[in-house]
């Protein structure tokens, strides 16, 4: 269907196409479809998007399907959806430590963090937009405008452009919201960066579910050819 959809019209239009195929298959071949996958793509909140409830998408779809099955005299197929991102995106956030700060007068202020495109490539890859705050100073007024940049040697390693935050200081904790989807799953070891840990948090309890990679992990699959070992031993 697509991604980040906030309107149910495309789903209803697609369902009509699918129901036409269900009808044709039944009449031409005598086969009744037992399962329909209605897809996913339900929108989530990254910044200020108003996220519709699942019922907004599914209630009209199910009503149309029920009416179709009644008209056709057939049992309603099992319905499958793919909620994916809409379940996990807002359930996750990324925590970074602020490092160096560079204020280019009249241009912009850069606040660097100890992560970036290696753990969340979406802003660099296709301009995804996120919201963040200084977690250790969340009650302070956001009087500063800064561009949050990563640690990679890439000018495009930007997490958030023109973020409104309190004046950042080295050591501050930056929280970036709605990174539960396509963050860890798209992480890489670019620039020989270890992938960070994943921690499950619920009701004041925290449990490690993916440990932080070490540099030893990055080298674990490296193999030194025998010819190079001989050259090394000779010296």
Model feature map: region roles:
Residues 60, 74-235:
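Charged (often Lys/Glu-rich) extended helix/loop segments that serve as interaction or gating elements
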Residues 1-102, 165, 191-193, 202:
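Active-site loop/helix belt of alpha/beta enzymes
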């Amino acid at each position: 269907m697509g991604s980040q959809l906030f309107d149910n019209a495309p789903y209803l239009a697609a369902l009509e196409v699918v129901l036409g195929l269900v009808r044709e298959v039944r009449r031409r071949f005598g086969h009744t479809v037992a399962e329909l996958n209605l897809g996913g793509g339900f929108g989530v909140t990254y910044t200020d998007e108003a996220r519709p409830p699942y019922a907004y998408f599914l209630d009209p779809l199910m009503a149309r399907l029920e009416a179709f099955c009644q008209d056709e005299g057939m049992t309603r197929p099992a319905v499958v959806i793919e909620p994916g991102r809409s379940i996990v995106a807002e359930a996750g956030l990324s925590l970074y430590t602020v490092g160096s700060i560079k204020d280019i007068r009249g241009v912009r202020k850069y606040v660097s963090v100890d992560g970036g495109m290696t753990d969340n490539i979406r802003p660099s890859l296709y301009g995804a937009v996120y919201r963040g705050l200084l977690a250790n100073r969340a009650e302070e007024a956001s009087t500063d405008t800064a561009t949050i940049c990563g640690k990679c040697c890439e000018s495009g390693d930007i997490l958030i452009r023109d973020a409104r935050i309190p004046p950042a200081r080295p050591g501050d904790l930056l929280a970036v919201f709605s990174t539960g989807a396509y963050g860890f799953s798209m992480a890489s070891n670019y620039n020989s960066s270890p992938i960070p840990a994943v921690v499950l948090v619920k009701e004041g309890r925290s449990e490690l579910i993916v440990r932080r990679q070490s540099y030893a992990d990055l080298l674990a699959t490296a193999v030194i050819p025998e010819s190079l070992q001989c050259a090394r031993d000779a010296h």
